[in-house]
């Protein structure tokens, strides 16, 4: 396969069916109406019923969608994609009955990945992460968040974030980087959590932000990780640097982290299996997105469901993500997560599809550019040979896109995908 830029998607994409809820505004385009999308210079210039296509676009090339269903490009808003090694041994431990906390106390968990990540060079981490990203892109993902948090020292956190930036450049995909230095206490700081938080706030975060490597800041607030007070210190440091925050919140217990995050205008609170009504109310008031991570729930064999009905009643937007990581969610299909969100968490199909598009984009602060189709937005959309949009959540991850337009270029046609590879539309 020769390496060259993806072919431009400029032209008229016609004979399409719009997924319900796909449009960024309230344009009255019925989902059963044959639709067209006009792309020029990598952006959507017009979208609507084919019969209403303005004559001024008639000279553009035409792409026959063949009646395909079109959705916005998918958004995976919570991943730990860059790391060294894997943790299959912990899978066996959990099958034998070990809890999340017991695995961590036995030397596994996050610290196990820290050792492997520190031992790997930047190029090695890129080589390991690239096939993972390719699998997600093959699902129709057009934007992705990648966290640090397996370095837990300045040079190693920098290494992870640099790899994340490189992945975005190599694959032509929107990557939002999140600094998760407060993911776990590194072994060399055992018993000195405040000293480590001081390092995170005073040295690591300012340095990485100055290098342009940080788009947002996250903390794991939990009894086996960092306290509310320590979390707030990190949020204050992020606030001083003008960076948005998010939180691993209420996964194993109700720490009150969601309410704290909402006070800082958090983009999202993620996991939230033990989220309280007070946390829900605070998130609603702040406009904070609830990110559901069914892969981790499934892998950990959790039985405490997130409060879906209460979130729904409160009108808190719910996103769905893979939470790809080597320990608790080795998942690489966002469509499978949509299915699991429906079957395990009882989301409706429209909620699940909004969760991997519109609401996921909002969880990354990308709501004006990603997750919905609209005039002036970058051309990020996916064509599917499906009869009904419900099939996106119905199949157990086996449904491959027909065509992916990512960042205004035809990134996939068929099942082939590679960084900067030319694929004929």
From Swiss-Prot:
Keywords from UniProt, A to Z, are: Cytoplasm, Histidine metabolism, Hydrolase, Iron, Metal-binding, Zinc
Give the record's pathway.
Amino-acid degradation; L-histidine degradation into L-glutamate; N-formimidoyl-L-glutamate from L-histidine: step 3/3
Q: Where does 4-imidazolone-5-propanoate bind?
A: 87, 150, 183, 251, 328
Where Fe(3+) is bound, by residue?
78, 80, 248, 323
Q: What InterPro entries has UniProt attached to this entry?
A: Amidohydro-rel (IPR006680), HutI (IPR005920), Metal-dep_hydrolase_composite (IPR011059), Metal_Hydrolase (IPR032466)
Q: Does the keyword Iron apply?
A: yes
Molecular function terms from GO = imidazolonepropionase activity; iron ion binding; zinc ion binding
Which transformation does this protein catalyse, written as a reaction? 4-imidazolone-5-propanoate + H2O = N-formimidoyl-L-glutamate
Q: Which cofactor does it need?
A: Zn(2+); Fe(3+)
Q: How is the cofactor bound here?
A: Binds 1 zinc or iron ion per subunit.
What CDD domains does this protein map onto?
Imidazolone-5PH
| Zinc found in the keyword field | yes
Residues binding N-formimidoyl-L-glutamate: 150, 325, 327
| Amino-acid positions noted as binding Zn(2+) in the UniProt annotation, renumbered to this chain | 78, 80, 248, 323
**Positions of transmembrane segments:** none
Give the enzyme class: hydrolase
What function does the entry list? Catalyzes the hydrolytic cleavage of the carbon-nitrogen bond in imidazolone-5-propanoate to yield N-formimidoyl-L-glutamate. It is the third step in the universal histidine degradation pathway.
Family the UniProt entry places it in:
Belongs to the metallo-dependent hydrolases superfamily. HutI family.
Q: What is this protein called?
A: Imidazolonepropionase
Instruction: Please name the taxonomic classification of the source.
Output: Bacteria, Pseudomonadati, Pseudomonadota, Betaproteobacteria, Burkholderiales
Q: Which gene encodes it?
A: hutI
